[in-house]
Amino acid sequence: MNKKLLKGKIMNIKRIIVLVLISASSGLLCAQRKTVNMSDRYGILTVTPLDKYTGAASLLKTNGVRSLTDVSYGDGFGGVSQKIHVGITPQGKDLTESYEYNSLGNLQSRTLPVPVLSEGASGNYKQILKSAQEYYGHSNVCSRFAYEASHRSLLLKEFGVGDEWTGKAVSKKYSCNLESIPAQRCKRYLVSAGGELVESDSPYADGSLRGIRSEDEDGNMHWEFYNSENQLVLSRILDGDTFFDTYFVYDEYGNLVFVLPPGYQDHPDLDLYAYIYRYDYLDRLVYKKLPGCSPSYLVYDAVHRLFFSQDGCQRNDSLWSFFVYDVYGRVVVEGECGNSDKHVRTAGETVVLGTLMEGDTGLAYSGYQSSSDLVDPCVYVVNYYDTYDFRTRNGFSAYNFPEGTVSAIGNLTGSILCTHGSSGFIYSADYYDINKRIVKSLSSRVNGGMDTYATEYSFQGSPLSVLHTHTDSSGYSLTERYTYTYDHSSRLTRVSHQYDNNPSVLLLEHAYDELGRLQTDKLDNGIYATDYAYNIRNWLTSIEGSKFSQSLHYTDGLGVPCYNGNISSMTWKSGAGATPRGYKFSYDRLGRLTDAEYGEGPSLSVNTNRFNEQVTGYDKMGNILGLKRYGQTSATGYDVIDDLSLSYAGNRLKKVTDRSTTPAFNNGFEFKDGIDLSTEYEYDENGNLTKDLNKNKTAIQYNCLNLPSRVMFANGNSISYLYDAAGRKLRTVHVLEGDSVITDYCGNVVYENGVPQILLTEVGYVSLTDGQYHYNLKDHQGNNRVVVDEEGAVEEVNDYYAFGGLMQQVPGRASSLISIMARSWIVKVGWAGMIMERGCMMLH
């Protein structure tokens, strides 16, 4: 290769050694690395092409194809002293970060990445400390590491970046177990020959366990103790003199058998608190028990693949889940069967194999025949690989699936998923390009329709466009196309959307800062813009838009400073509201929220305490024992609306008592203490809630995926759910006073009583009745806070309590039948049964 090709790229290059050869016809292997030797430094140049190229030389020419170029400079002792991402920033600058090491080769300092305009050729080694200080506006722009002065070089302290954190570090102390010091005292648990837990009378000998004490920037301490096999034996979190201990107990072969969480130390009940695991003679997990649940059993075939499994609910019905494999070890059939325990125990003597036969025979007429007998099998999943011969089989032929034009050897090509809650099936097929990327995907729908997705990719594999065609059995059809645009560094910049013959809409536009962080979002052809800001540690500090804004404070603001990443205070403005509202937060030593003090105005000193939440106690497992919640009690009054006392059986909520007698104003959100019994909540063998008498839920039924299939209320109302075997929700049926509303979820098309109503988009939805776009404005956790239409009019405002309850909702015009229906449920049933689903209010 001609050395002149690298002139201006890296100075003083003496030679180039090609380490990786790549093919110009393939976009899968898209990086080329070269070792570069220089008179004073050496480095590795990595070029990742973004376009198809004709040869390696074209990647290094300034007029060649688009590519990403990285340079790593060595320090001469095997470490990397500097990494440079050449021209990667939005303004085309080099993003550079530097590293320094001590005399033993340990990382001593790491400078934050900084965008630098190269002097001379891009990719040159740079001195960036001063540039970083100027860019960030902080003098402390280096993470620094301190080590023990010994041959072990154990990390003692890590000082993070940011002037606010000067002198604050995440520190570690290395010690051992000592019986004389309470914080370093360790119980000794053993596993008997019969697999039972035994607490030894003789503790660990002093010094037999290696101990590490960690302390974060706020002084919260955590001990970990390891045995001679480097297995974690004890994890201890300290809250003053109170210890929260989790013990890990191993058998003589090193298998984890018991996990004993903090609650067990005060109430040594294995059934309620312990995680229990058992193994066979080949160290395969055969028994698993979670706290408060019946155990699950696992059975393997002769080549160690899971063949049968059974949870507590299945055991009550004498059922087992089964898995059948092809000759390559791929799962081809899943389902449930009624095999006897005796038959299941002999599974380890055989190799389970599913053979694909001709015709509609075998398990569920799928064509697969199992080598092992299955009693009354009910098939939930069927998978086909390598070819598209399944197209003519039972079920597929009704949908006219096309033949594949590119070899799919080694890939999943088709599948059948049962619909839990009905007798139907979902049929699907995937088609690939030569690089094994899915370029076309077809799937039938619960309403008899079909969805087709066709995807075009860039050279390096990013989607450029997705064409979606949806049909249903009535003849209705819908077509939508997403188009994606990327910048020179392959960052997503624009998302356009068009459905049917309507004009294309610039749905979303991204702008990034020089560090690659999202800086601005623009929705709806740029009409609505949201700006984002971050602190020096890349923690989100601000979301700023005309309809929703939010400020997050960590070490500054009105609350007690938190240096470990907890939010100390938060303010927001929603909809047309001009007055900031917010919370000041307090935490205990375990990082659990204890107080959320509400206020309004810039200093949160107006209308204080109106929507406070206070946790009056936690148990050792982190369950809330008491909660006080304030809210609106009249047109002008605010007071305690919930004063809750919660009791548990292990981790299961057993009873809730509300000592507050003041109801929330205008049927607002609050806990409804609907009954006073010693047990108000009941559960099944798998730990699923089956009764919630406070919410008048007299029965909650579940399918084999442990997903709720039906919720029944005391007044005769009910909600039923339909899922496919992968757990995707397909249908919801609400029965209210004898009237039914059926909601079908056909991909991103939502039907109400057979009529298409909503087309979900990446940033909201389109109401299909009028063709209007609606946009969801989200907070830092992804909650939908404001819904606006395509003209920027506010349709809905949601404000939340600190623990997630809906503090206040201000609806505008009802924008969908889902929203209208949800509000009618709230009026008739109350807030006690409400959840948020797809950004809309739904009952559960």
Would you name each region that the model predicts?
Residues 1-36:
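Bacterial Sec-dependent N-terminal signal peptides
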Residues 46-52, 72, 82-89, 109-116, ...:
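Beta-turn initiation residues at beta-strand->coil junctions
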Residues 62-64, 90-97, 110-149, 273-327, ...:
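Aromatic/His-enriched, Gly/Pro-containing loop or helix-boundary segments
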Residues 66-68, 93-95, 141-143, 208, ...:
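Short, small/polar residue-rich loop motifs at catalytic or cofactor-binding pockets
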Residues 71-72, 99, 145-147, 172, ...:
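A residue-level detector for well-ordered beta-strand positions
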Residues 166-193, 225-226, 233-234, 239-263, ...:
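Carboxylate/His-rich catalytic cores and anion/metal-binding grooves
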Residues 176-178, 258-259, 264, 277, ...:
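A motif-centric feature for acidic-aromatic and gly/ser/thr-rich catalytic loops and repeats
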Residues 181-226, 358-433, 550-563, 569-572, ...:
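Extended repeat-based solenoid scaffolds, especially LRR ectodomains
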